[in-house]
Design a protein with these regions (language model features):
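Conserved pre-motif I regulatory segment
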Residues: 1-26
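A basic/glycine-biased coupling hinge at the interface between accessory DNA-binding modules
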Residues: 17-18, 39-145
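Conserved lysine of the Walker
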Residues: 30-31
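Post-Walker A alpha-helix
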Residues: 34-35
Length: 145
């Protein structure tokens, strides 16, 4: 465990009695606490990496956490460890359960650029502002479902 940690951070890392919310401001060491806790659970507590999930909001944060954990656990297998974004976790679950829902697991998810292209193709020769308005109408319809 890193000597750079303060007492509350070390306490959070060693806490094992249930869920734990780490709430702190930017730059306060939340990512360090989470990555150190993952290493602690695997190395010191013998937890299987496949029983650990760290979910974050951005791809950048997920990549940083993956790199930090890899550095902390160098030489230790992390097979099955999940460190990803909420969106990536959602897609993973949907792909795993796609057949049960009657879909193929190799489905595509459209981003805003893909949607713009489809609306543009369907609308024909209209200006960009009209295409954006059509996208908003479609979005409102979807939200009303």
């Amino acid at each position: 465990m890193s000597a750079q940690l303060n007492a509350p951070q070390r306490e959070a890392i060693r806490y094992l009695d249930g869920p734990l919310l780490v709430l702190a401001g930017a730059g306060s060491g939340k990512t360090r606490v989470i990555t150190q806790k993952i290493a602690y659970l695997i190395q010191d507590c013998g937890m299987k990496p496949s029983n650990i999930a760290a979910i974050t909001f951005t791809n950048k944060a997920a990549k940083e956490m993956q790199e930090r954990v890899a550095n902390l656990l160098e030489g230790t297998s992390t097979s099955g460890l999940t460190i990803c974004t909420f969106h990536a976790l959602g897609v993973r679950i949907l792909r795993e359960e796609a057949k049960a829902l009657g879909y193929k697991p190799n489905f595509s998810i459209f981003d805003s650029t893909d949607c713009y292209g489809i609306v543009s193709d369907l609308a024909g020769s209209v200006d960009k502002a009209t295409i954006r308005k059509l996208q908003n109408v479609i979005s409102n319809w979807k939200n009303a479902l």
